Amino acid sequence: MLFMFPRKNNSQTLNESVHTSDMSFHQRSKIATEVNEWLHLACQDRLSDLGMHAETYKEDFDLDRLPTGWGPYPSLDANDVRAKFISDVGIAFAWRFGAIVFVEVPKETRHREVDLLRESLGLPLRDPRVTAEKFFIFIDSARSAQVEYNRLVLPSINQERLGAVAQTLAQSVAMEYYEAVVTQAKVQVLAMLDRIRRQGRIAIPAMRLNSQIADASMAQAEVVGVLHLLDKPDTLWNDAEMESIYLDLRNAFDLEERFKSIEYKIETIKESLRIVLEARNSALAQRLEIIIIVLVGVEVMFSIFGRFHLFGW
């Protein structure tokens, strides 16, 4: 059976979305103040890390259909992400490409929030998450900013910094989804090529091959759509320390290298399918040429026999 790239269901129309820039200055300031106050309380006299949990799903999220409580985040584009304060607990972020990031939210509450979100979006509740990842932020005013494996040390934190870290973590789990999909597709294409080599013939309809090439192109476009967020958030232009840390975070998660690897694998898959399609079309053309030659030969034979019949032979 020919492989298939799973297609994400993306019903969101960007033109219908709300840009963060559409929020009034008062709204942005109010939400930013609330987040900063929560961060101050959460980190006050704290000796442990701020825990972050990210997970991604097969479906895209229609941000305009999120349940009550979800809204734009001051330092991030509302076309891409919405956020929610979870009372007395923490903050959640939902990205349109199917990723969710929780900050200081316990497991039971995470499950409840995901169920509410998926129910509002009309998505199957039983579908499991595809990937999950944990990350931590430790605030220590006596230390300089640095990345330590799955932990970020910062001398201070605000809503802009939290948003930048959450965005990077969301991209990382989304990349894991595409890495798994592309790897599986590559294995299936190699199996198909091996079957063709052993059988010596291509028994695959051209329509199916064309469909798979289109699916691969769509998957490639989805990855590019996720990774366009690699552009540095505008708010970091005024935060030299976090700008440097943002670059370190991207390197720590290997986002650029993973993106290049996925693109290369997809291009390899598409090229392999094109070669098979061309070989199939070439073989079909050869068969058609043979059929035409045979038909011409038959027509000539009938013509000759007809002439013999006229002469009484």
Predicted features and spans:
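Generic structural signal of hydrophobic/aromatic residues within well-ordered alpha-helices
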Residues: 66, 113, 117, 178, ...
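Short Lys/Arg-enriched alpha/beta "domain-start" segment
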Residues: 2-155
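Juxtamembrane/interface alpha-helical elements of multi-pass membrane proteins
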Residues: 142-210
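Short, intrinsically disordered, mixed-charge
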Residues: 115-123, 183, 187, 228
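Membrane-associated alpha-helical segments
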Residues: 193-311
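Short secondary-structure boundary segments
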Residues: 58-77, 159-180, 246-247, 298-301, ...
